[in-house]
Amino acid sequence: MGVRFCKDGHVIQIIIENKEEVTMKKMKEQQKKREKTKNGRRVIAAKKIQAWWRGTLVRRTLLHAALSTWIIQSWWRLTKDRLLQKKRRAALSDYALRERAVVKLQSLVRMWRIHWRYCQVLNAIYVIQCHWQCHNCQTCALLRGHCVVTATHLQFHIEIINP
């Protein structure tokens, strides 16, 4: 309850307040404020939860993309390595084949040269034998000889031995 007076003294206003109504109004206002703060807190909490969830989804998507990239890169490295190994094996096989061919050709050339020298020695021996058989030696000397074939030339050693 309250009484108010004007300074002039003309008007007197008397206000009688019901305490129950005032307390009810105050309680309603406080409840509205609480609801607003609760709703505000809820909105803030909901925003935080939504932000966390969006972040989780983004991280999950990025992780999935990174794993997919890693898998593709690993596959590509493996494929490149297999191709490189295949090329190396093919190059090694070609090299070995060429080396075998060269070695075989060299051995055939060496064999041909040695055979040619052998044929020369054989022809020389035939010539010497033929001349020796045609020659009538009265002392009947013996011939002892040997032949050495080297890579570059041919050596004969013939000894005539008188008994």
Curated annotation (Swiss-Prot):
Q: Name one GO molecular function term.
A: calmodulin binding
Residue span, IQ domain? 42-71, 98-127
Pfam families per the UniProt record, alphabetical = IQ (PF00612)
What's the domain of life for this entry? Eukaryota
Q: Which UniProt keywords apply?
A: Repeat
Which InterPro entries does the entry mention? IQ_motif_EF-hand-BS (IPR000048), IQCF (IPR039887)
The record, for PANTHER family, names: IQ DOMAIN-CONTAINING PROTEIN F2 (PTHR21633:SF4), IQ MOTIF CONTAINING F (PTHR21633)
What's the protein name?
A: IQ domain-containing protein F2
Organism in which the protein naturally occurs: Bos taurus
According to the entry, what is the taxonomic lineage of the organism?
A: Eukaryota, Metazoa, Chordata, Craniata, Vertebrata
